[in-house]
Regions:
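Serine/threonine-rich, low-complexity intrinsically disordered segments
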Residues: 5, 17, 39-41
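Broad, structure-driven detector of short, well-ordered beta-strand segments within folded domains
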Residues: 24-41
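Short, mixed-charge low-complexity intrinsically disordered segments
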Residues: 42-94
Length: 94
């Protein structure tokens, strides 16, 4: 619901990106990408699939709560996420 206050839409369209660091991976060579979008309806957490589409995921939520005993997540910028998606696009196209 838009209250008409300045910045309201910006808050609800914020996206945070996370590099997924699997076993023996680093921030320079992550194994995946996740994002959290803040919408008027609430948070939407997703992970990038090999076909470069986004699918709902509980990975960020579990990681925040300490329930994820798998990959580590590291917050990255939108620019870094774009560059990472391009790297995955090239890598997964092979």
């Amino acid at each position: 619901m838009n209250t008409g206050s300045p910045g309201h839409d910006a808050i609800h369209n914020e996206i945070k990106y996370y590099a997924v660091l699997g076993h023996d991976r680093s921030i320079s060579d992550p194994s995946g990408l996740a994002r959290r979008t803040f919408t008027a309806e609430g948070r939407l957490d997703e992970s990038l699939r090999r076909d470069l589409t986004w699918v709902r995921s509980s990975e960020i939520y579990q990681w925040e709560r300490g329930e994820n005993f798998g990959p580590e997540l590291v917050e990255i910028s939108a620019g870094e996420a774009e560059a990472l998606m391009e790297r995955f696009r090239q890598k997964w196209a092979q």
